[in-house]
Amino acid sequence: VYLSGGVGYVVDETGEAVRGSGLLDFDGERYFRYRADGRIYADGALHRCGDEVIFTQADGTLLRSGAVGEYTFDADGFYSCGSETVDEEVREFIASCTSPGMTRSEKLRACYSTVRALRYLGRNAAYGAEVQTIPHDRLLEFADKIFTTGKGDCYNFTAAFCLIARQLGYRAEA
């Protein structure tokens, strides 16, 4: 692997860049080639790969079976909130209010408008004003409730939109 300035190339045994775009499994590692010439990210950041969110590490490999903060990545290197059920609910919600031709920001705006239009039930007494961040296990619970019932309180709305934004590749905290 040749790296410079947060990008690089996977090189084969002849020293040539492995060309093509998309995911590349090479020597037991996985890389994301984002250009046809084979360029990879090596920047320690979130990226979109089709409909999936990935995290490229500083060495150019995808983070697999690991986590960065509340961002968990499976064995394939794809983002998961940690619940297959909620992951599917988020994907279905995004698909229900977006179209394939939309940009990432257009998808975020469409999802925001759709979440905002869900029924509001009033304040949940689960937390007081001193709580700044929803604990991750409760985040999943709150998101699941609004995705399955179509209604919720401020915590449900926040949890749902946070997970939607993450699935679209944005850094988001609730």
Protein language model features and the residues they cover:
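Hydrophobic/aromatic-rich core segments of domains that either
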Residues: 156-174
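A short, highly charged nucleic-acid-interacting micro-segment common to nuclease
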Residues: 146-155
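Extracellular adhesion/carbohydrate-binding repeat motifs centered on closely spaced tryptophans
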Residues: 1-88
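Aromatic side chains
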Residues: 9, 31-32, 71, 112, ...
